[in-house]
């Protein structure tokens, strides 16, 4: 705008200069015109006309010049605008050229990446084809193995049925011998006749004793400060071992209710106990992740079995050997221990925490009860799972084997007690009572030594006794007020012992 104003001002100055010059020239020639006008009066009118005509032409020239000046100003402005637009276009072209160069570089890079990805895809396709080939081969092998496994299972089931039939025949013979024994009192003759079938002779220390139905509290003992978590009798004896939260193991005479001795050295609460078949050692599973083995005669710790990484909640010892012990802990392992060597000889791994275990009569199979409610059977030598049964809807708290080894009792947090046939793993009895509620994940039930009764404690302090053959309650024992944690039956038929959460132990006859 400033430049346009300057241009208009310059044009106006030029017009004024021309008018001034015209006036000066007109004034300068006025005398000559006057002198000539005299002789030329005759031509005055002609010259006047020409003058007027020239003035008219001059005015037209001025007007044309003014229009040209205005047009010039417009053209100059348009030229400057076009120049600015041209500069903008040049800048835009430069930016577009740079962007084009960048896009070309990106295109080159993407092309290289595409080639690399294509090569990778080709390699993956080749690997996929190879894996598919391997998968087809493995599938074929699995199908073949499944077929062979099915055949082996069928053969094993057939063999199992045959073994069960033979065992049933032996049991029938055994029951017949027991009937004769009870009728005629020929105990010695009966034991010799059935020796090698179910029972061993007196040298093996197992013999038949008829159990009595407990009804009376013979002794009420304050055994431990805090809860008493485990009790166990010596084999074929009335001597009772108790273990509690005070980390002590105590030995009691159940006839008089007096303390025989105390065993110290445990670094944790006693959660479970077992006594060797020769009654020389007692083993305690503790919350300190260890097992402690005491020599009963000296009262000293013979072994400290280390290897578990969490609390050891269950332990059992071989029925025939005083050498082999199994334990279960919350590190989800079962360990086999050699007491002669004092260390672990085998470890079994599983996924659900184990609350209770027991060994079979031959010491080759471990029965374990787990938090998922299942009963599992393990080959202790190979560590392989032999079988699994869904026995309870909640955690299994106790696993007990009958004296003849044909039945196994499991108790669960669903307040149900199941009796399984160890040969077929079928439930042959289910025991429950409206007032019987288990107090903890380690509430222990037990079977009487003659395999006729089952005893289990309840959270209300009572102990329920069922007839195994009839499935009905034959006795309810009420003396304790705290939740019952465990029960144990003496191998000589009586007494039955129960321990509660306050550390009291009652013996029942």
Curated annotation (Swiss-Prot):
Which residues form the WD repeats?
223-262, 265-304, 307-347, 349-388, 391-430, 437-478, 480-509
Q: Please state what the protein is called.
A: Autophagy-related protein 16
The scientific name of the source species is Arabidopsis thaliana
The record's listing under PANTHER family reads: AUTOPHAGY PROTEIN 16-LIKE, AUTOPHAGY-RELATED 16, ISOFORM F
What Gene Ontology biological process does one annotation of this record name? autophagosome assembly
Which SUPFAM superfamilies does the UniProt entry name for this protein?
WD40 repeat-like
Q: Which UniProt keywords apply?
A: Autophagy, Protein transport, Repeat, Transport, WD repeat
Q: What does the UniProt record say this protein does? A: May play a role in autophagy.
Against CDD domains, the record matches this protein to: Atg16_CCD, WD40
| Protein encoded by which gene | ATG16
Task: Note the Pfam families from the entry.
Answer: ATG16, WD40
